[in-house]
Amino acid sequence: MNITIISVGKLKEKYLKLGIDEYIKRLTRYAKLNIIEIPDEKAPENLSSAEEQIVKNKEGEGILKNIKDGMYVIALDLKGKMLSSEELADKLQSLGVAGNSNIAFIIGGSLGLSEDVLKRADYKLCFSPMTFPHQLMKLILLEQIYRGLRIIKGEPYHK
């Protein structure tokens, strides 16, 4: 399985980088992993909705350029479907069985994802109705992918 994580924003916090590096190392036993960071656009606090749309569209263009033909795209979106760890494992396994071995997970910037990215997504996944910093979301996503792949292999994991 080939997994690509496309996220907006460069990771700056050292503690998150350490956690992400740990899960990248763990995941190499189960999948080929590629992480792509798209530069985030400057977004001051008081943007109009039109200005927010411009920022999301620019970030979206960078995301879409990195989605290859044939990739199954899972966008992280607050309006997406919430899954348990076991259900995520089932989703990953069913994608592999169906021949979708190239999976891209998309993490938007602080304003979310553009409509074009959401339209390109084959599936929308929500981790929680709460909002998380997108850098932290990358760590949470990697942990859940790792957990899901261990579940698929029938290996023990912490419940």
From Swiss-Prot:
Keywords: Cytoplasm, Methyltransferase, rRNA processing, S-adenosyl-L-methionine, Transferase. GO terms for molecular function: rRNA (pseudouridine-N3-)-methyltransferase activity. It is found in: Cytoplasm. Its main location: cytoplasm. InterPro entries: Alpha/beta_knot_MTases, RlmH-like, tRNA_m1G_MTases_N. Pfam families: SPOUT_MTase. S-adenosyl-L-methionine binds at residues 76, 108, 127-132. It is an enzyme of class 2 (transferase). It catalyses: pseudouridine(1915) in 23S rRNA + S-adenosyl-L-methionine = N(3)-methylpseudouridine(1915) in 23S rRNA + S-adenosyl-L-homocysteine + H(+). Its EC number is 2.1.1.177. GO terms for cellular component: cytoplasm. Signal peptide: none annotated. Belongs to the RNA methyltransferase RlmH family. NCBIfam families: PRK00103.1-3, tRNA_RlmH_YbeA. Specifically methylates the pseudouridine at position 1915 (m3Psi1915) in 23S rRNA. Homodimer. This is Ribosomal RNA large subunit methyltransferase H.
